Design a protein with these regions (language model features):
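Carbohydrate-associated surface elements
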Residues: 154, 176
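Nucleotide-sugar-dependent
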Residues: 289-298, 305-328, 335-350, 362
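Conserved acidic donor-binding segment of nucleotide-sugar-dependent glycosyltransferases
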Residues: 324, 347-379, 388-393
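Short His-centered aromatic/hydrophobic patch
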Residues: 92-97, 116
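Nucleotide-activated donor-binding/catalytic signature segment of Leloir-type glycosyltransferases, i.e.
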Residues: 247-296, 351
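Membrane-proximal helix-turn-helix segments that form the acceptor-binding/catalytic region
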Residues: 76-83, 99, 103-107, 130-150
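Nucleotide-sugar donor phosphate/pyrophosphate-binding loop at the beta->alpha transition
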Residues: 69-73, 108-113, 121-141, 161
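Conserved donor-binding/catalytic core segment of Leloir-type glycosyltransferases
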Residues: 4, 197-223, 236
Length: 438
């Protein structure tokens, strides 16, 4: 199969969306498919492609107009390249203010598919008239797509509910994880690489891009409660983003002893990420952006990994948690929140028991096969979930083993690629038969 995979993404920066693009492209290429990834040209050069071709569309670095320019330019460039290479299908990342995927398909006669990592009407905070434009554009390009891939069943439900897209056209395919990159390593060796003491502390971590819906505030509030009982607990927050400065200020407002390795916003920084300073001098360490190769080292250094997703937007349409899959790949137990839109209950596994220190948290904290679930937006419950694992090293070890086994069985990018190809093969059967979704 020959595939064009078009996204508005800066491949020089590693975060959830770019990881998904690169890893899926690599997995499809490994399975013998001819993949061309098409993205805008940003200031920093993207990482060299691994097994797939990369084309970049000239970009205009004008604030508020970058995406609009890409939408306009991609209509020309993708059409031109598609007429030359004649891919079997055009696979577009979800867009907002455009119907470019539909137009290019009409101009070239090539079927197209859309991948939705979220549901824009649930996420955007814009005026009524702008939202009307978004919904009209999405109704056009979702409605005329041959298939719509969503990273969670909840997103598929929302697209069906709002736009009436037939359910047979909606194909939920969860994200994966690179099991070679995210694999267990010796915990003490990981700590030595980061400059951390091997013993004497309980390390609890989070990794990701700082969005308002990441829930790091809940973790920070829980940290204050944990430190009251376990003063040797240390919290390592790996990442950066638009919400970064707010989070460091919030941690300090809680009275936590904070260390910043580098700025937490999106500004480039040449400051080193490691070695980390002596944990005796901090309780919460914000690392800022770290090199890709260091992310698995950080995760492997932790006793417990966290994903404190809030409800609200996540509960409604959610997304597919990359970080939990990465934690699982490294064999680290997870404390997360029970959010249907992200499918955390499925990830953590069948609940075996419930435990709480008092009546208030009794029904809010549950133990699964690969971690602990708590209700969202509740720092007391999240702290209790952490305490369960802090107190029980053998439980942490068993959950970590279960997590890695689950990742190997359910979370590989090769499996995601196979499911994606299967969805596209259905498109080709429909095209050849002359049928159309109604």
């Amino acid at each position: 199969m020959r595939l064009f995979y078009i996204n508005y993404a800066d491949l020089s920066v590693a975060y959830g969306a770019t990881v998904c693009i690169v890893e899926l492209a690599k997995a499809l290429a490994r399975q013998g498919h001819e993949v061309t990834v098409i993205v805008p040209q940003f200031k920093r050069n993207p990482l060299p492609p691994d097994g797939f071709d990369l084309l970049t569309i000239p970009n205009r670095d004008i604030r508020f107009l970058r995406k609009v320019w890409f939408y306009l330019a991609s209509a020309f460039w993708v059409t031109l390249w598609a007429l030359r290479k004649r891919p079997d299908i055009l696979y577009w990342g979800e867009m907002t203010y455009t119907i470019t995927p539909y137009l290019v398909s009409k101009l070239t006669g090539i079927p197209y598919a859309i991948i939705a990592h979220g549901f824009a009407p649930d996420e955007l905070r814009v005026s009524r008239w702008r939202m009307a434009i978004v919904k009209w554009c999405q109704k056009v390009y979702f409605g005329n797509a041959s298939v719509v891939v969503t990273v969670t069943p909840k997103i598929a439900e929302r697209i069906h509910e709002v736009y009436g897209i037939p359910k047979e056209k909606l194909v939920p395919i969860e994200n994966g994880v690179n099991l070679e990159r995210f694999r267990p390593m010796d915990k003490f060796e990981a700590r030595r690489q980061l400059g951390l003491p091997e013993t004497g502390y309980i390390y609890i971590g989070w990794v990701g891009y700082f969005f308002p819906w990441s829930g790091v505030e809940t973790l920070l509030e829980a940290a204050k409660k944990i430190l009251a009982e376990f003063p040797n607990a240390r919290f390592i927050i790996v990442g950066h983003g638009v919400w970064g400065t707010h989070l460091s200020d919030f941690a300090q407002s809680l009275g936590l002893k904070v260390h910043l390795m580098k700025p937490l916003n999106n500004a480039p920084s040449h400051l080193p990420s490691i070695p980390l300073p002596d944990p005796a001098t901090w309780q919460v360490c914000f690392t800022g952006e770290v090199a890709n190769e260091l992310v698995p080292v950080f995760i492997n250094s932790w006793d417990i990994a966290t994903a404190p997703y809030p409800g609200g937007r996540n509960e409604k349409s959610g997304g597919s948690s990359m970080k939990i899959r990465e934690y699982f790949g490294c064999g680290v137990p997870v404390v997360t929140t029970d959010v249907a839109g992200i499918g955390t209950r499925w990830l953590i596994g069948e609940v075996e028991t419930e435990r709480g220190r008092n009546g208030e948290t009794e029904s809010k904290v549950t133990i699964g096969e690969r971690g602990v679930l708590t209700v969202p937006d509740d720092a007391d419950a999240f702290a209790e979930g952490l305490l369960i694992l802090i107190r029980d090293a053998s439980l942490r070890e068993q959950m970590g083993k279960n997590a890695r086994e689950f990742a190997e069985t359910h979370c590989s990018w090769d499996e995601v690629a196979r499911q994606t190809v299967k969805a596209f093969e259905g498109v080709f059967r429909v095209e050849r038969s002359g049928l159309r979704f109604k």
